[in-house]
Curated annotation (Swiss-Prot):
<dbReference type="GO" id="GO:0007018">
    <property type="term" value="P:microtubule-based movement"/>
</dbReference>
<dbReference type="GO" id="GO:0090307">
    <property type="term" value="P:mitotic spindle assembly"/>
</dbReference>
<dbReference type="InterPro" id="IPR031794">
    <property type="entry name" value="HMMR_C"/>
</dbReference>
<dbReference type="GO" id="GO:0005874">
    <property type="term" value="C:microtubule"/>
</dbReference>
<comment type="similarity">
    <text>Belongs to the TRAFAC class myosin-kinesin ATPase superfamily. Kinesin family. KLP2 subfamily.</text>
</comment>
<protein>
    <recommendedName>
        <fullName>Kinesin-like protein KIF15-A</fullName>
    </recommendedName>
</protein>
<dbReference type="GO" id="GO:0005829">
    <property type="term" value="C:cytosol"/>
</dbReference>
<feature type="domain" description="Kinesin motor">
    <location>
        <begin position="26"/>
        <end position="364"/>
    </location>
</feature>
<keyword id="KW-0175">Coiled coil</keyword>
<dbReference type="GO" id="GO:0008017">
    <property type="term" value="F:microtubule binding"/>
</dbReference>
<dbReference type="InterPro" id="IPR036961">
    <property type="entry name" value="Kinesin_motor_dom_sf"/>
</dbReference>
<keyword id="KW-0493">Microtubule</keyword>
<dbReference type="InterPro" id="IPR001752">
    <property type="entry name" value="Kinesin_motor_dom"/>
</dbReference>
<keyword id="KW-0963">Cytoplasm</keyword>
<dbReference type="InterPro" id="IPR019821">
    <property type="entry name" value="Kinesin_motor_CS"/>
</dbReference>
<dbReference type="GO" id="GO:0008574">
    <property type="term" value="F:plus-end-directed microtubule motor activity"/>
</dbReference>
<dbReference type="GO" id="GO:0000922">
    <property type="term" value="C:spindle pole"/>
</dbReference>
Amino acid sequence: MPPGTKGDPSNVTQPLPCLPSAEEDAIKVFVRIRPPVEGTLTGVDGEQGLCLTALSSTTIRLHSKPEPKMFTFDHVANVDTNQESVFSSVAKNIVESCMNGYNGTIFAYGQTGSGKTFTMLGPSESDNFTHNLRGVIPRSFEYLFFLINREKEKAGEGKSFLCKCSFIEIYNEQIFDLLDSASAGLFLREHIKKGVFVVGAVEQVVTSAAEAYQVLSMGWRNRRVASTSMNRESSRSHAVFTVTIESMEKTNDLVNIRSSQLNLVDLAGSERQKDTQTEGVRLKEAGSINRSLSCLGQVITALVDVANGRQRHICYRDSKLTFLLRDSLGGNAKTFYIANVHPGSKCFGETLSTLQFAQRAKLIKNKAVVNEDTQGNVSQLQAEVKKLKEQLSQLLSGQMPGDISVARVPSVGDNNMDYMNNFIEAMMILEKSDREKKVLLQKVVQLEDLCNKKEKFIQSNKMIVKFREDHISRLEKAHKEGRISLSNNEQDDFIAELKEEIRTLKEQVEHHPRVAKYALENHSLREENKRLHSLQSVKRAQEVTAQMIAELEKAFLEVSVSEKDRQVAPMHSTPIQLDNNSLMSAARMRERMLQLESELATSKQEYEEFKELTKKKQVEQESELQSLIKSNQHLENILEAIKANKRHEVSQLNRMHAAETIKNMTTPTKSYNLRSRLVPRLSPDAMPNGLMDTPKSGDVMDDIINEPIPPEMSEQAYEAIAEELRIVQEQVTALQAKLDEEEGKNIRLQQQVNKLELCSTQIQELFNSERSNWNKEQQDLIAQIKSLEKQKQENKSQEDVLKSEVHDLRVVLQSADRELGAVKGEYSLYREKQEKELSQLSARHMDVQLQLDNVRLEHETLLEEKRSLQDAFDNLEEVMKFEIDQLKQEISDSKHENETLRAEFSNLLELLETEKERRQKLTSQLEEDKENKTKELLQVVDENMHLRKQCSELMTKCEQQVTELHGLEHSLTSSKEMIADLEKKNTADKEVVADLMNQIQVHRTTIIHKTESIDLLTRELEDIHSKYSIVLLAKEESKTVIEEQEKQIEELRECLERKQSADNIEKELLCDDLAHATEELEKLTEAFNKQEALLHTHEKELVEKEQQISELTNQVKLMTDLEISREQEKIRPASSNSSSPVVLPETPRTPEGNPYDSEIANLQKRNTNLEILVSELNEERTSKNEEIIRLKMQLCETENMRLEIQNLQGMCKELKSQLENCNNVMKDSNDQKPSDMQDLKREIEKEVSERMEKGKATEHILKLQAELEETRNILCTKDHSLNELSKEIERTRSLEAKAFTEKEEIRSILEGKYEETEKLSHELDMLRKQVLFLAEENGKILGHQNPNQKIQYLVKLKKENNKLLEEAEKLRIENLFLKESKKCEHCN
C-alpha cells in the first residue's frame, strides 16, 4: 500500500540522516506516515481531517482528547519522505551487519491500508523491482550483492559467498511455501545450531540481485491478496522472505565460516470489521491476523517486563509468527521496526495502538552475536587453542596479551585467589583515588578562591591608578583654565573619590593574596592533623587496647567468680561434687592466663610506642599551631601598618598634587623669564649693557610677564612632569617589592624561632611528665610482682587439690562411657523416628509447594488478563472520546451549514422572483420591439443563458443539501446507536472488571491462608533441624577428640610421599623443557635471519606501490569529477525539455563501474597480496612471540620451583623439628615405631639433595634467559618495521572506505533525483490531460460562429430554462413541506 495510492510518488528527495543508537543491539523503530488519499481533508496541526502530525525527525504528536499525546522514536518520516531515504535509514546498517556475521530483521507493522507493502516492495505494478519507487526489499538485494562483489574484489580467491533465499507465508496460522505452489501446510522445528526453521521449505541459491528479484516475484504471485473497503489489494497473510548469507575465508590451513540471516517481514495489517466491512472468509482471515498480532504484542510486553527485571514467561509458541522470529524478538539479531500509520481521523484507534506497540518494542534489547565457526587441520586448531588459552590465562592473571614481561604464572588453584586479591587491590586503589580526588577538588576550590582574590587585588590596583590619573587630569584642566582654587562641589567630589580609593585599598587588604595563601596553608595543616588522627594504625591500636581491656576484665570476673566458688566449696569433695572442676579446665585456664599475660605485655609495648609517637606528633602540631598563630598576629600587625602607610601615602599624594599644581603654574613663567633674559645676549653690542639693565627696566618686565605663554613651553613642562612621575612610580614599586621580600624573610625566620622555642618547652614538659610516669609505673610493677608471687603460692596449693581430683574424674569418665553407649542406642532409635517424620514432612512440603506454584501461575495469568483488558479499555475510552468530539463537531458544522443553506435558499427564492419579474418585463419589451431590436434580443438571450446556468447550479445545490440532510440524519442515528453500544460495552467491561477484582480478592485470601500454613510447617521443620543439629554436633565432638592424633601421623606420612613424587616429576619436566628450549632457540635464530631478508624486499615493493596508488587515486578523482559534471549536464537538458516525453534511464541494480575500475581492482588485488604477506609475517611474529613467552613462562616456573624448593627446605627443617617432637611423644606412647621415624628422616635427606640439584638447573635456565632477552630486542625492532607497514595498509584501507562512502552518497542522491523526475513526469501527464480537456471545452464554446445557430441554441436554452424553473418550484414546495414536518416533530 503506497503513500497516497498504490504507485504514487513521494515528494522529498533529501536523504534522511543515519539514526543514532543509545545501545548497539536495542530494537530501533522507524515511523512512516502515509499521505492522505486525494479528496480527503488534509488539515494542518489537528484540523478535521488529520489525527496526528510529525513535529520533528524524532517526535510525533497524536491529537487525542483532552490533551494531545507525544511519542518519540528513533526516526519519524513525514508524508513527503521518499523510498531511498527510508532504505538508507533502515536497511543499510542491517545489510552491512549481516555481511559481518550478525542476524538482521526488518518488520513492517501497521493497520490495513497504511502502506506496509509499498514500503517493503514498492508499487503494485509488474516492474516494481526495477521501478524508481521500489521498496526496501529490492534495494536491500542490490546493496547486499554490491557489498558481496566488493568483498570478493578485495579478498580475491581467499573469500567466497553463498546466498540462499526462502519465501514463506503464514495464512490462518498455517505455513505455506510461496516458492512451491503445490506445498501443503509446513511445520516448524527447533535445532541447537540452526534455531527455529521451517521443515521442507525450498531454499534457492542466488548469485545476483536479478536472480533474487526472480525468486521474490515468483513467490509474490502465489501470495494471498484480496480487496476490502479500506484497501484495493490487502495482504491476507504474513510474508517472511529470508536470505541466508554464508561466507568462507581461508587463511593458511584455517577456514573461517560466517553465517547470517536477513529476515524481511511484511506483516498483514490489523483490521476492524466495521471499517473493512468483511464477511465470511475475509472475516475469518481478519480474525487469525488479529490473533497473531495480539500474540506478537504479548511477547513484546513480556520482553519489556523481563528487561525491567520482572520474571515472566515469554509465550513464543502461542503463534507461528512469534516462534519463527524468536531470535529477532529479544534474541540473536539486530532488528528494525517500520511502523506505518494512517493520519486520517477515522483510523485514530488503530494509529494509537500502532504507536503504543512501537513504543513498547523500542524498549526491547537484543543480544546480537557474530555467527562464526573455524575449521582446519588438527595442528593448526591446536595451535589456535593454545594461543587463546595463553591469552586467557594472561588476562586472568591481570596481564595484557601483548605484554612480554617475566612474571610468576599462577597455578589453576590459585587463579581465584589471585583474582580476588587483584579485585580487592583495585577496589582499594579506587577508594584511594576517590579520596585523593576529593582532596584535590578542595585544593582546586581554594586555589580558585585565591585566584579570584588576586584578580580583585589587581582590579583594585587598576581602580587606584585610574582614580589617580583622573585626579591628575582634573588638576591639569584646572591649571589650563587658570583657576587654582577649587569650588565646594569639586571639593566634595574630591573627598568622595578619596573615600572610594580608601575603600578599594581596604578591599585590597582583605583580598591580598598573601593573606589568602596563609589561610590556605592553615587549612591544609588542619586537614593534615585530621588525617593523622584518622590513620589506620592509630585506629587499630585503639581498637586493640579496647579489646584487650574488655578481655582482661572478662577474665578477671571469671577468676573472681571461680575463687568465690572455691571458698564456698569444701576442701575434700567427692567425685560427684567435683564433676565441674576438671583437670582439663585447669589446664585451659593456665594456658589462657599465659596467653593473656603475653598479649598484655605486647599490647602495653605497642601502646607505649603509639603513645610516644602521638605525643611527638602532638608536640610538633602544637608548635606549628603556635607559630601559625604568631605569624597570623604578625600579619595582622603588618596589615595595620600597611593601612597606616596607605593613609600616609594618600596624604602625601594630596600634598604632592598641590605642590605639582603650583610647580606647573610657576615653571612656565620662570622658563619664559630666563628665555627673555637670554635674548639680549644674541647681539654682541648690547651684551654687557643688557645684563646690567634688565633688572632696572620695570616696564619691560611687565610687558614680558603680561605676554601670553607659548604652547610649546607648556607642552615641554607637561612632558617633564610626566617623566618625573613615572620615575618616582618605578622607584616606589621597586622599593615596595624589596620591602615585601624582606617582610617575607622576616616572617619565616620569626616562625622558625617560635617553632624552636615551643618545641624546646614542650620537650622539657614531656621529659618531666615521662619521668613522673616511669616512677609511678615502677612502683605499680613492684606491687604487681608481689601480688603475682602470692597468686603463685595459691596456685601450687590448688594444683595439689586438682591432682587428687583427677583420680576421681577418671572413675567418673568410665561411668560416663557406659552411659554414652546407652545414649547412642537411644539416639539411633530416635534418629530413625526423625528420618521417618522428615520424609513425611518433605512430602507434605512438596505438595504445598506445588499448590503454591499453581496459585502463583493462576495469579500471574489473572494479572496479565487484567492488564490486557485495562489496556483495551483505555484504548476504547480514548477512541470513544475522540469519536464523540468529532461527531459533536460534525453536528455543529452540519447545523451551521443548514442555516447557511436555508439563508441561501431564501435568497435564491427572492432572486428567482426578481428574475421572474425581470423576465416578464423583458418579454413585454421583446413583444413590443421584435422587429427593431434584434441585437438587444441577443443580449437578453445571453443573460437568459447565464440565468439558466445559475438555476442549474441552484438545483444541484438543493439536491446536495437534501442528500446531506438525509446523510446527517443517518449519521446522527448511527452515532446515537454507537454511543449506546459503547455505553453497553462500558458497563459490561465494568462488570467483568468487578468480577475479576472479586476473584483476585478470593485468591488473595486463599494465598494468605496457605502462606500461614506453610509458615507453621517451616517453623516445625526448623525446630526439628535444630534438634537434629544439636545431636549431630555432640556426636562429632566425641569422634573428633578420638581421631585427631591418628590423623596427624597419617597426614605427615602422606605429605612426605606426595612431595617426594612431585619433586621427581618436576625434575624430569625441567630437564625436558631445557632440551626443548635450546632446540627452539636455534630454530628461532634461523627463522629470524630469513625474516630480515623478506622484510627488506617487502619494504622496497611497498614504496613503489605507494607511488602507484597515489598516482592512480589522483586519476580516479579527476575521472569521477568529469563523470559528475557530465551527469549534471545530461540531467539539465532532460529537465528543460518539458514538452517532450521524459525518457528515464533504468536504475542500475548494482552500481556501474567507471573506466578506471580495472586499475582500482588491480590495485586492490596488490593491496590484498601485501596484506596477505603482512598477515603471514604477523603470524610468524606472533608464533615466535608465543614461543618466547612460553620459554619465559618456563623460566618463571623454574624460578617458582626454586622459591618452592627454598620454602620446602624451610618446611623440611620445621618437619624435622616436628618429627623430633613426635619421636619424643611416640617414645612415651609406643616404643615400637623408631624404624618408621628413621625412614622418614632418610626420605627428608633425599629430598634436600634433590632440591640442591634443582637449584643448579635454575642457574642454567637463567643463562638461557639472557639469550632470550637479546632475541627479544631484535624482534622488537622487526615489530616496529612491521607496525609501520601495517599503518600504511590501514591508510590505504581508510582511503578506499572513504571513496566507497562518497560513491554511495552520490548513488543515493541520484536515486532521489530519479524519483523526483518520475514525480515531475506524472505531474506533466496530469497537466497535459487538463490542457486537452480545456481545449475541447473552448472548441465547443467557439464553435457557434453562425447567428442562426446561436438563435436556435438560445431557443433550446429557453425551453431548458422553463423546465428548470418548474423543477425549482416543485423543490421549493417540497422544502416547505419538509420544514413544516420538522416543526411538527419538534412540537410533538
